[in-house]
Amino acid sequence: WFLDNFCFPVKEYYLKLGFDFIKESFDISGTEFIDKYMKRCHELQLHQGAIEILQYVKSLGIAQSLLSASSQVMLNEILSNHDINDYFKEILGTDNHYAYGKEALTRKWIEGLNYDAKEVLFIGDTIHDKDIANTIGSDCFLIPKGHVSRIRLEKTGAPIFDNLNELLQWFQNR
């Protein structure tokens, strides 16, 4: 059910779950979830092939950035457990834990780059990632290993890779 219904803004997903924000505000519900999530974030694992693709792309001299709808504080905490920060030129999260603001964050990021948006490749796992890539004029590849089902991702028209190893093979064969 989750993969077929999760969406941004996250508040809309909470409404699909049946939350009544008249009875309890989204600020309270969202904060309760994040507090519980952060207590277990050290348990999060990287997807199989994550290190290999980060290493390979870096070996090509291609700059990598990580942009997330997660808050910068949350992102820093999660990444501290994986020792992958050195692969990224920039690591950017939002200024809140409600997943608001990734589009504005991305616009600001792209304006600061010395690249044309057409030279940027977004790799994500949500429809929102594809929407943001479209907004800034970049290509986007999607991997159905996150919050959204493959069927929903296919509807975006973006190329779909089943996993990071498949994406790595694409890079190696280009």
Model-derived features: positions:
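A short, structured active-site edge motif that brings together acidic residues
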Residues: W1-N5, N85-Y100
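Conserved H-loop
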Residues: I84-K89, D116, F161
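Acidic, Mg2+-coordinating phosphoryl-transfer loop and its flanking beta/alpha structural elements
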Residues: L121-F161
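N-terminal helical cap/lid subdomain that shapes the substrate entry/recognition surface
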Residues: W1-Q48
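Conserved Lys-Pro-Asp/Glu-containing loop-to-beta segment of HAD-superfamily phosphomonoesterases
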Residues: G101-D131
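Glycine-rich phosphate-binding loop signature in dinucleotide/nucleotide-binding domains
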Residues: L60-I62, L113-E119, R174
